[in-house]
């Protein structure tokens, strides 16, 4: 599915929450990301209720070396070597769609979630004057970062939020910069898993994308560490961006 005007390097293919193959691939990518892989059951429930949509990020023919990039991704993550099939039977708000049944090799994913008043009030937003969608679950293969795919995905889901869902704001959250960029945190989250260190923090990157911080919570996430299963509360910054 093309979202932005003009040729695009990414297609955004709906995740089929009814497919064991799609659910398992999402688990593999979340585990590779190192972040909230244990939430897949919640993803299925939210998608089934029409409140959330997950999109696979799939390279298009606009990428000159598409096959080589897919091969690079698979070499890094061999469990993803078999292509999925576009089988999602619905899109937003349970709207029926006709799947293409074409093979696809997703190199990441991103999600949009419609926010209810109960979601907005705790972070200080007025549900009476704001219709918001939350952007989350953004993941681009560590083997293919620095190609601009993350920024492209953000612009696309912002467009979907505004044009298809009628939202005037996108919100998101991430770990605060001071925590993420600590040496011990980067060693545990990136180096130990064989992944490159981030060039900038998530916080700085979202600000670069036009978002502003409006709320912080020192115990925003209860995170389960992939290496030993221990849990820790993490400090979180909440961001917003007006779409119109």
Model-derived regions, located:
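Glycine-rich acetyl-CoA-binding "A-motif" of GNAT/NAT acetyltransferases
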Residues: 103-107
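Conserved acetyl-CoA-binding loop-helix of GNAT-fold acetyltransferases
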Residues: 140, 146-160
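Conserved catalytic-core motifs of GNAT/GCN5-like acyltransferases
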Residues: 173, 187-228
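Conserved acetyl-CoA binding element of GNAT-fold acetyltransferases
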Residues: 126-142, 173
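A conserved beta-strand-loop-helix scaffold within acyl/acetyltransferase catalytic domains
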Residues: 98-99, 110-128
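Conserved GNAT acetyl-CoA-binding A-motif
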Residues: 161-197
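Conserved GNAT-family N-acetyltransferase fold
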Residues: 108-110, 133, 138, 237
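Short amphipathic alpha-helix that is part of the acyltransferase structural core
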Residues: 1-83
């Amino acid at each position: 599915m093309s979202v932005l005007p003009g040729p695009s390097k990414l297609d955004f293919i709906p995740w089929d929450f009814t497919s064991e193959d799609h659910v398992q691939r999402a688990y593999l990518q979340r585990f590779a990301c190192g972040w909230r892989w244990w939430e897949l059951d919640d993803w299925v429930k939210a998608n089934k209720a029409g409140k959330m949509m997950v999109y696979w990020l799939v390279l298009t023919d606009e990428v000159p070396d598409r096959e080589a990039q897919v091969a690079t991704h698979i070499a890094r993550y061999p469990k993803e070597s078999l292509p999925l099939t576009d089988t999602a039977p619905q899109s937003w708000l349970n709207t029926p769609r006709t799947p293409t049944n074409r093979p696809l090799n997703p190199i990441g994913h991103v999600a949009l979630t419609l926010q209810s008043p109960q979601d907005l009030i705790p972070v200080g937003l007025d549900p009476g004057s704001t219709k918001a969608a939350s952007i989350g679950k953004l993941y681009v293969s560590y083997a293919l970062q620095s190609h601009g795919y993350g920024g492209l995905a953000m612009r696309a889901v912002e467009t979907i939020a505004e044009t298809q869902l009628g939202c005037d704001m996108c919100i998101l959250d991430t770990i605060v910069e001071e925590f993420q960029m600590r040496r011990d945190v980067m060693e545990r989250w990136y180096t130990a898993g064989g992944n490159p260190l981030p060039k900038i923090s998530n916080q700085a990157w979202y600000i670069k994308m036009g978002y502003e911080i409006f709320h912080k919570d020192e115990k925003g996430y209860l995170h389960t560490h992939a290496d030993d299963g221990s849990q820790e509360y993490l400090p979180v910054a909440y961001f917003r961006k007006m779409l119109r």
